[in-house]
From Swiss-Prot:
Protein name per its UniProtKB record: ATP synthase subunit alpha, mitochondrial
Upper taxonomic lineage: Eukaryota, Viridiplantae, Streptophyta, Embryophyta, Tracheophyta
PANTHER family, per database record: ATP SYNTHASE SUBUNIT ALPHA, MITOCHONDRIAL
Subunit composition and interactions: F-type ATPases have 2 components, CF(1) - the catalytic core - and CF(0) - the membrane proton channel. CF(1) has five subunits: alpha(3), beta(3), gamma(1), delta(1), epsilon(1). CF(0) has three main subunits: a, b and c.
Alphabetical list of InterPro entries matching this protein: ATP_synth_asu-like_sf, ATP_synth_asu_C, ATP_synth_asu_C_sf, ATP_synth_F1_a_nt-bd_dom, ATP_synth_F1_asu, ATPase_a/bsu_AS, ATPase_F1/V1/A1_a/bsu_N, ATPase_F1/V1/A1_a/bsu_N_sf
GO cellular component, as recorded: mitochondrial inner membrane; proton-transporting ATP synthase complex
């Protein structure tokens, strides 16, 4: 049988079509929902899924795979599970959870997945970063040596914080934990305005976990009034958000802060507060049927916080010399710092600022318990002048507290004890500070110098706050600059501040 020319032509055409045939196949691995409830979906069929991978349900809701079991996968749902039904298809996305990062987020309020919730449109140019990454290794790190000023006299003098440190703020509810964090953000306004280069600027990330939406709105207002939003990012997983988002928010905020750390810049991140994150994680773990441990928390709750806080670091000069400083907040119940979560976080961090209800109600604000508060690495970053000025401050306050307890029982005290009580009361008074009024470091030094060197000893207690306000207003700028720049105070450099403070104290001393 012979091929006609027509058949040969057709064969050639078919061959060329088959050779050039190409289609872009997209293969999706899908599974089906076996059961759903309480924000947890059990899915069958996703055999190749990774731990921590994002999945998408038929309704468009996203989730994250946390439990990889023999028969099924336990997925926590980001959002409402009411639209998910048994038998629904679930599709792998192939990506681990990531969030936007970069300078385009500054001044914005985003949720735990990095989606803007401030009604100001989409984000500008940005990169995406995984929320869970490996922490910097030992060789990549450097000892903390640069100060991170909070603007609070009690903190910068007694529990100094350095860039790259983790300092815990711990206390009962309504003792001023968030106030310390906000004051620290506000204080960076004046610090950043003095910065001569990008490497001196400090960017701030505030992560609100399980807070009321009204509280977050109030915070945005305070920061915008203080012109602090321009260098801040707010990540909000509020009380009305599902537990998975409250669990994820600190990691998302950390990924945004790491952008600055890894690009030779400096960032401060505040987790407010990690107690609520632990509660959200406990809820998810119990619903996933993981075995409970102490206080019904899962066994890996320590790892939950340690892997987050270890990401705060001061990088070595070879890796850009950037830093990420963390201020985690923990809420205690009736001052019990020996509970499970508080002891965990205390052991992870480089020190803690302890706040007490009793001090708060006595009008000592910030209500810092100087005896329990400590900074394990911050003193290496403290300015030399501040270190010299407040060297005896902590000791004098400790002696004052000890003697004050016994002084209640008897009035016949010797002159030395009376002088100690007198000085201690004035030091306590000078460390008080109103909210949202951070003080530059050079003004803190001169005020504390006045108290430590006895310029307030003959003043009535009710006049000390007036005297303290008067010092920064009337002091010469050159004198303040010399305190910071010339590397500490020697006998020669003390002559000018002594003369100024003595003259300034006269109107306030009782006649």
């Amino acid at each position: 049988m012979e091929f006609s020319p027509r058949a040969a032509e057709l064969t050639t055409l078919l061959e060329s079509r088959i050779t050039n045939f190409y289609t872009n196949f997209q293969v999706d691995e899908i599974g089906r929902v076996i059961s759903v409830g309480d924000g947890i979906a059990r899915v069958y069929g996703l055999n190749e899924i990774q731990a921590g991978e994002m999945v998408e349900f038929a309704s468009g809701v996203k989730g994250i795979a946390l439990n990889l079991e023999n028969e099924n996968v336990g997925i926590v749902v980001f959002g409402s599970d009411t639209a998910i039904k048994e038998g629904d298809l679930v599709k792998r996305t192939g990506s681990i959870v990531d969030v936007p990062a970069g300078k385009s987020l500054l001044g914005r309020v985003v949720d735990a997945l990095g989606v803007p919730i401030d009604g100001r449109g989409a984000l500008g140019d940005h990169e995406r970063r995984r929320v869970e990454v490996k922490v910097p290794g030992i060789i990549e790190r450097k000892s903390v040596h640069e100060p991170m000023q909070t603007g609070l006299k009690a903190v910068d003098s007694l529990v100094p914080i350095g860039r790259g440190q983790r300092e815990l703020i711990i206390g009962d509810r309504q003792t001023g934990k968030t106030a310390i964090a906000i004051d620290t953000i506000l204080n960076q306004k004046q610090m950043n305005s003095r910065a001569t280069s990008e490497s001196e600027t400090l960017y701030c990330v505030y992560v609100a976990i399980g807070q009321k939406r009204s509280t977050v709105a109030q915070l945005v207002q305070i920061l915008s009034e203080g012109n602090a939003l321009e260098y801040s990012i707010l990540v909000a997983a509020t009380a009305s958000d599902p537990a998975p988002l409250q669990f994820l928010a600190p990691y998302s905020g950390c990924a945004m802060g790491e952008y600055f750390r890894d690009n030779g810049m400096h960032a401060l991140i505040i987790y407010d507060d990690l107690s609520k994150q632990a509660v959200a994680y406990r809820q998810m773990s119990l619903l996933l049927r993981r075995p409970p441990g102490r206080e019904a928390f899962p066994g890996d709750v320590f790892y939950l916080h340690s892997r987050l806080l270890e990401r705060a670091a001061k990088r070595s000069d070879q890796t850009g010399a950037g830093s990420l400083t963390a201020l985690p907040v923990i809420e205690t119940q009736a001052g019990d710092v020996s509970a499970y979560i508080p002891t965990n976080v205390i052991s992870i961090t480089d020190g803690q600022i302890c706040l007490e209800t009793e001090l708060f109600y006595r009008g000592i604000r910030p209500a810092i318990n100087v005896g329990l508060s400590v900074s394990r690495v911050g003193s290496a970053a403290q300015l030399k002048a501040m270190k010299q000025v407040c060297g005896s401050l902590k000791l004098e306050l400790a002696q004052y507290r000890e003697v004050a307890a016994f002084a209640q029982f008897g009035s016949d005290l010797d002159a030395a004890t009376q002088a100690l009580l007198n000085r201690g009361a004035r030091l306590t008074e000078i460390l008080k500070q109103p909210q949202y009024a951070p003080l530059p470091i050079e003004k803190q030094i001169i005020v504390i110098y006045a108290a430590v060197n006895g310029f307030c000893d003959r003043m009535p207690l009710d006049r000390i706050s007036q005297y303290e306000r008067a010092i920064p207003q009337s002091v010469k700028q050159e004198l303040l600059q010399s305190l910071v720049e010339k590397g500490g105070l020697n006998n020669e450099r003390k002559i000018e501040p002594d003369a100024f403070l003595k003259e300034n104290a006269k109107p306030y001393i009782k006649g």
